[in-house]
């Protein structure tokens, strides 16, 4: 043994540290589901792409490349309390992508790893008639979910404002006939009339004037027939008088 010996140290040498870092495999982010990588493995926040940073730290990337508030990676995917808090430069961002609910595209077979079932999706073509883009919420909603048929809208209006059936015209007429028939008709109880009924009060008054002799009687100029009303005398003269018929 030589007399010179190196002092023993508990700390690993720099060479051993580099060997340890080189042995760490590069896990693809698509298959990685564990807690976010820590700084002790040799990965810095600048080495991560914006998409990887989103998966690891839970940052929501907006339309203009700005990042929202950072969330704890351990609270979302594992038991680690380590979290990233950083700003992603706009130059490192891929083409604009948006947060879309996974249930908006059923049957795709994609299982989201993001909280609240959110997926990263590229915007569809502006000419696509099956989707509507809403910049306020950055979500795409199918057009059939927003459409409402005329039949459905009419049913909703009928349920909110029920229509009241108005009584028919025939029922009103029948009701008026019943009222008129229930009214007592005027009658004459003079000698010889014995309660004769009249359709109106004016007819009863005229009958009483005729019986009292207050009305001048009208005579036919041809045959001399006497009439209590001039209307009846005129009809008799022009249509029924036998003297006119014989003279013609």
Swiss-Prot record:
<feature type="compositionally biased region" description="Polar residues">
    <location>
        <begin position="36"/>
        <end position="49"/>
    </location>
</feature>
<feature type="region of interest" description="Disordered">
    <location>
        <begin position="62"/>
        <end position="86"/>
    </location>
</feature>
<keyword id="KW-0539">Nucleus</keyword>
<feature type="region of interest" description="Disordered">
    <location>
        <begin position="1"/>
        <end position="49"/>
    </location>
</feature>
<keyword id="KW-0804">Transcription</keyword>
<protein>
    <recommendedName>
        <fullName>Probable C2H2-type zinc-finger transcription factor orf8</fullName>
    </recommendedName>
</protein>
<dbReference type="GO" id="GO:0005634">
    <property type="term" value="C:nucleus"/>
</dbReference>
<keyword id="KW-0805">Transcription regulation</keyword>
<keyword id="KW-0863">Zinc-finger</keyword>
<feature type="zinc finger region" description="C2H2-type; degenerate">
    <location>
        <begin position="218"/>
        <end position="241"/>
    </location>
</feature>
<dbReference type="GO" id="GO:0008270">
    <property type="term" value="F:zinc ion binding"/>
</dbReference>
<comment type="similarity">
    <text>Belongs to the GLI C2H2-type zinc-finger protein family.</text>
</comment>
<feature type="compositionally biased region" description="Gly residues">
    <location>
        <begin position="65"/>
        <end position="77"/>
    </location>
</feature>
<comment type="function">
    <text>Probable C2H2-type zinc-finger transcription factor that may regulate the gene cluster that mediates the biosynthesis of brefeldin A (BFA), a protein transport inhibitor that shows antiviral, antifungal, and antitumor properties.</text>
</comment>
<keyword id="KW-0862">Zinc</keyword>
<keyword id="KW-0479">Metal-binding</keyword>
């Amino acid at each position: 043994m030589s007399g010179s010996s190196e002092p023993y140290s508990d700390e690993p040498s720099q060479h051993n540290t580099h060997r340890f870092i080189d042995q760490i495999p590069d896990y693809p982010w698509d298959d990685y589901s564990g807690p976010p990588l820590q700084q002790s493995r040799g990965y810095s926040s600048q080495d991560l792409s914006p998409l990887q940073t989103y998966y690891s730290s839970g940052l929501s990337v907006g339309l203009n490349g700005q990042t929202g508030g950072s969330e704890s990676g351990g609270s979302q995917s594992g038991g680690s309390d380590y979290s990233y808090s950083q700003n992603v430069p706009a130059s490192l961002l891929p083409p604009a992508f948006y947060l879309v609910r996974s249930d908006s595209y059923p049957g795709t077979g994609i299982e989201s790893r993001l909280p609240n079932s959110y997926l990263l999706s590229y915007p569809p073509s502006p000419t696509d008639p099956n989707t509507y883009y809403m910049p306020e919420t950055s979500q795409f909603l199918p057009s059939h979910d927003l459409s409402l048929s005329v039949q459905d809208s009419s049913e909703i209006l009928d349920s909110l404002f029920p229509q009241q059936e108005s009584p028919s015209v025939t029922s009103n007429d029948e009701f008026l006939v019943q009222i008129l028939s229930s009214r007592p008709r005027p009658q004459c109880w003079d000698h010889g009339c014995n309660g004769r009924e009249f359709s109106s009060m004016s007819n009863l008054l005229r009958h009483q004037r005729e019986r009292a002799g207050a009305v001048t009687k009208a005579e036919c100029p041809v045959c001399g027939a006497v009439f209590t009303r001039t209307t009846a005398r005129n009809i008799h003269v022009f249509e029924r008088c036998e003297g006119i018929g014989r003279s013609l």
